[in-house]
Amino acid sequence: MYYINEYRICINKVRNKLQYFHKPGVSIIMTTNKTKYLDNVYNNFMRINYAIKELIIVLNNNKIDKEYCNNKFKDFNNVRIFQIDENVTLGECLNFCVKQAKYDYIAKMDDDDYYGANYLLDSMNIFEYTDAQVIGKAAHFVYFEEFNILALNAPSIENKYTTSWLQGGTILLKKSVFNEVKFGNVNLGEDTYLYERCNEKGIKMFAGDRYNFVYMKHKDMQDHTWKISSKELLSECKIISNTSDFESYVVI
């Protein structure tokens, strides 16, 4: 645990230095076609320790009961839920969310992954010490539910500018970026399209640290847009631990 303790010291220094800086509002956007992850969405939104935030959800499945979803979030005045026909692509749904956003920063989050309490704060702080317009994580933890294994993917791309890729569920960017680029009008690779357009236009991207986010790899590939088996993805990762308590490794 020495490595995480060293990181904790560094990250806490940054938090302390920037604690009195103005924290702009953030519009969290996500799409879902499954109601079974609504509890996870709820828990992530509650957990994230960031004062000025809103959540915009697009239901991209005609069979989902929108009223059921509204009732789930009835205690929030900063959550809005829309329903868009399932024939509309994921990229189009995300671009729709951006148009609805009332804040100047957009955070794309996934419905089934894990986000720690300081996830958004640490990501927003990066804008204070870089000139990047797009922030995210390349190095990131992966939890394999099938095996109870916590692993690390892309460990070499961390705390540096990047022109390659960022994990799709961790994208945080200035809303003004969408004056020049959009998510791709596709169901797979909509974020890759955005990165490519950013590179073409000289929009800088920065990969932050690996902490406070976990990509949850489910046993059933139908639960994922990206159809890759657990064994194949695991072969691309570095195993950290066999554990049912991944939070102790990833939360700072």
Give the positions of each predicted feature.
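The conserved acidic donor/metal-binding loop of glycosyltransferases
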Residues: D110-Y114
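Conserved catalytic core of nucleotide-sugar-dependent glycosyltransferases
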Residues: K99, A117-N185
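Acidic donor-binding segment of Leloir-type glycosyltransferases
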Residues: M46-Q83
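Acidic donor-binding loop at a coil-to-helix junction in glycosyltransferase catalytic cores
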Residues: L188-E196, I203
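Catalytic beta-strand/loop signature of glycosyltransferases that borders the donor
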Residues: A138, M205-F213
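N-proximal low-complexity "stem/linker" segments adjacent to membrane-targeting elements
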Residues: M1-M46
